[in-house]
Amino acid sequence: MATSAGGGGTTTGGMRSTGGETAAGGSLATGGVGATGGITSAGGTKATGGTVSAGGTTTGGASGGHVGSGGTTGAAGASGAGVKTTAGNGPCDIFAAGSTPCVAAHSTVRALLGAYNGSLYQVTRASDKTTKDIGVLSPGGFANSATQDTFCTGTTCTISIIYDQSGKNNHLKQAPAGQRKATPDNLADATALKFTMSGHTVYGVHLPVGYGYRVDQTTGIATADQPETEYMVTSGTFYNGSCCFDYGNAETDNHDDGAGTMEAVYFGNWTSQGKGAGNGPWVMADMENGVYAQASFAANPNDPPLTSPYVTAMVIGRSGSFALMGGNAQTGTLTSFYDGVRPNGYNPMKKQGAIILGIGGDNTATAQGDFYEGVLTSGAASAATAQAVQANIVAAGYGN
């Protein structure tokens, strides 16, 4: 988004929910699936030392809980009705099965494909400026955080690259100067967001004001009016009311190039343009020159605050229409907050295909948030595919 930062106080805690959020009056996406208890990665790939692959759903859903080495289970998951998945799959396997393959996949906490065995991210050590790639414990598994801990002992480290797992080489690096902020953005402290997933210690990406990542020259990302699906797992307890904590499709020149030149997932409680119900934070779509909760800047009563520690936020972009979905990344299914026409002046879209994280398309860097995982796909995912991805996220065991 390219307008100047709006008002709104920073919220850094104290807004946790104890269950999944549903939109007041909002309908669950058709083709979606209900909560079935928990999800086990039944038959997930087991690594040396008893590590189970991160997340994974079975055909028709699975029961139980996804078990990590500590025996923690993910509660209240969902089944992916109509989408064929197999144990050990990641979100990108599920999107591919739904004919909407990932063209970018970023995470510092886990592999997003069942067979992925490469590096998740790179850290740079402050003491001598050397770098280290951080991989996974096993194919399709969690980050090998012990590698980072050893490398960064006695000094500090920043996350210098978040690697693209899709094979398209759309790696996120330090965001360069842009129209709104004429200097590069800061890189995240590699140890600032430590937590556990299914008993494994991992590190997310903590992005205070002034921090951000970007890649302008990409391969396979949607341009013009091409359809796409984008989601990120973020935090409902660390956000603010400024522009713009985004993940997704943006301008390639780091400037505001007008309405429709972006399509990114926004999360926060900025109210200068669109907004949802209550005080936020909300899932919205940043389409440049406008952050929208529906087809106008009017408040959308069906877009509720999502205040759980881990939030799934999704935007589905089609020719002439877009959809917003979201939910608790620890439990339950996604809820549809909006599915309808684009705002006036946004048809057709003029997407350019860069990827941003934590900032606006013109490098506005006054927002804040946390990032754990996210993807961009080629094509608009079905509701059933979206729900199967959510089930996989729940199964990964965020915070367990």
Identify the residue ranges that each predicted region occupies:
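Extracellular glycan-interaction patches encoded by glycine-rich segments
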Residues: N347-F371, A380
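Long, repeat-rich segments with strong aromatic
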Residues: Y310-S319, L324-G327
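GGW-centered surface loops in extracellular recognition modules
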Residues: K84-A182, A224, Y231, I393-N400
